[in-house]
């Protein structure tokens, strides 16, 4: 599962001209399920995202997670937006292939699981609408942008086996 996270001072998502989700300071998370992903990958990505230290502490170092953006326990917002294009294969030609992305029904199920778990674990969660054409606006704070990826279990197992035989 892939997450492209951006530290924002504010962000909003609109569908058909209406705001469906918005946050103040926090993280905009564009998320994508890949073929082979399960709820285990969704849970690992969420845990990583919620604990990833991208907010500045009193010394100006990126040392604080979205759960505590001011160092005093203030949680930042989390705006979760589905974006299957993150799984694009761009290695050849001039047209991306989306074969690596999960099928739409699997992607929806994993996105909804991710959002439900986020709402259980974090106090401020807003979302876009899965499968909708959305307009996302944001003020990127920094800019600070990170690509987080949790490979499907089968891929991780294959990498471990390759490392053993090397």
From Swiss-Prot:
Instruction: Name the Gene Ontology molecular function terms of this record.
Output: D-tyrosyl-tRNA(Tyr) deacylase activity; Gly-tRNA(Ala) deacylase activity; Ser(Gly)-tRNA(Ala) hydrolase activity; tRNA binding
What reactions does this protein catalyze? glycyl-tRNA(Ala) + H2O = tRNA(Ala) + glycine + H(+); a D-aminoacyl-tRNA + H2O = a tRNA + a D-alpha-amino acid + H(+)
Q: Which UniProt keywords apply?
A: Cytoplasm, Hydrolase, RNA-binding, tRNA-binding
Choose one Gene Ontology CC annotation of this protein and give it: cytoplasm
Main function: An aminoacyl-tRNA editing enzyme that deacylates mischarged D-aminoacyl-tRNAs. Also deacylates mischarged glycyl-tRNA(Ala), protecting cells against glycine mischarging by AlaRS. Acts via tRNA-based rather than protein-based catalysis; rejects L-amino acids rather than detecting D-amino acids in the active site. By recycling D-aminoacyl-tRNA to D-amino acids and free tRNA molecules, this enzyme counteracts the toxicity associated with the formation of D-aminoacyl-tRNA entities in vivo and helps enforce protein L-homochirality.
State the PANTHER family in the record: D-AMINOACYL-TRNA DEACYLASE 1, D-TYROSYL-TRNA TYR DEACYLASE
Q: How does it assemble?
A: Homodimer.
Give the domain section of the comments.
Answer: A Gly-cisPro motif from one monomer fits into the active site of the other monomer to allow specific chiral rejection of L-amino acids.
Its recorded name reads D-aminoacyl-tRNA deacylase
Q: Origin organism of this chain?
A: Ralstonia nicotianae (strain ATCC BAA-1114 / GMI1000)
């Amino acid at each position: 599962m892939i997450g492209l996270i951006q530290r924002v001072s504010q962000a909003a998502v609109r569908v058909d001209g209406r705001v469906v989700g918005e946050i103040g300071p926090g993280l905009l998370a564009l998320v994508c399920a890949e073929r082979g992903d399960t709820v285990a990958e969704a849970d690992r990505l969420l845990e990583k995202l919620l604990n990833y230290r991208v907010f500045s502490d009193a010394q100006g170092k990126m040392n604080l997670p979205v759960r505590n953006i001011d160092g005093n326990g203030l949680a930042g917002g989390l705006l979760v937006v589905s974006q299957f294009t993150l799984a694009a294969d761009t290695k050849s030609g001039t047209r991306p292939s989306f074969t690596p992305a999960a099928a739409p029904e699997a992607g929806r199920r994993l996105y909804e699981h991710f959002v439900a778990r986020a709402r259980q674990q974090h106090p401020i969660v807003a979302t876009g609408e899965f499968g909708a054409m959305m307009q996302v606006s944001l003020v990127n704070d920094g800019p600070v942008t990170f690509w987080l990826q949790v490979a499907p279990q089968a891929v991780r197992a294959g990498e471990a086996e390759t490392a053993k035989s090397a």
